[in-house]
Amino acid sequence: VAAPVGAQAADFAFQGAHIFPESFVQTGQNLEEWAKRVSEASNGRITFNIVHGGALLSLGDHLDGIAGGLVDVTSFYPIYFPGEFQVEGALTNIIDIWSEEAPDLEGVTHIHSTLHKEFPAFAAEYENRNMQMLLPLPADPYVIACKTEVKSLADLEGRKMRTFGRYFPILQQHLGVEPLTVPGPEAYQALATGLVDCVYSTPDWIYSNSLHEVAPHVFIPAPERARPQLFATAVVAMNVNSFNKLPDDLKQIVLDVSEDMKGYIGQSMEKVYDTALDNLSKANGATRNYMSAEDLATWAERTPNLLDQAAADLTAAGYPGDEIIARYRELAAAYIAGEWPAKQ
């Protein structure tokens, strides 16, 4: 619950929901921080009561819940609804292994927000479900956790790996593994029974779900830090009717707080990545190895460039796919070069 101490009675008391535990930083703690900042900036005129842990909305119904106004605000995962969020869903399911360098999580947050503003196709997907996207919430970068140690690309050959989504199976197939679709809640059992040998996910998710108990061997698919997805997998989203109840000054406060938090969000998730990797290293028999630059180049060379594929797929579906991907690449290059966004 976010409300400043000693504030006046709220003019707008909004209901929030979160499908995972509050302790989950990406979409729990960051949602609470956003709500706290909005409440403080409005001097208590806006307050939030956020119910965590799927007690109010679950993974399967949190889209209908926010769209239908059961709640006013939520951490929404477009990655779980690729049919309705085709544009956003494409970019959340790709990791750029073809460029020499990729943006960090702060860069992901800035790029996600900017493309939303520049291409109406993104906002239209939210408007179709009566939502407004306010703040991207990127995941910590994906790593590989296996039941036995992995030191190189060759060690992955023939292993079975959990997958999901449209583009991840392609990325994983060219690691030399056999991708198998396994729902997240079943990952532990799938590893324990040998249905899969490895998972490909964020270190925080791996640790939070205790997968390190059965898969303590971490392989970072990069020479140093793992690379993030092109887009955030989740966002702070508000029901449009709820947002429109606010007078203009309070609407602006919500928008300003969301804009100002982009740097904070990226930095908080970089810390989550580091902390989770440290936690995974404490597992019994744990190992951690890194993909060599040579293996990364080999992986990229034998994998179709999924940014190009996404551009073609989006164009075929009637979206400005070529323009979106070209602009993504332009912003990513400018961010990496330190030329964008302008330092304040």
Regions found by a protein language model. Give the residues of each.
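N-terminal secretory/targeting leader peptides
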Residues: 8-107, 121-344
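N-terminal FAD-binding dinucleotide-binding subdomain shared by FAD-dependent oxidases/monooxygenases
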Residues: 112
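N-terminal signal peptide c-region/cleavage motif recognized by signal peptidases
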Residues: 2-4
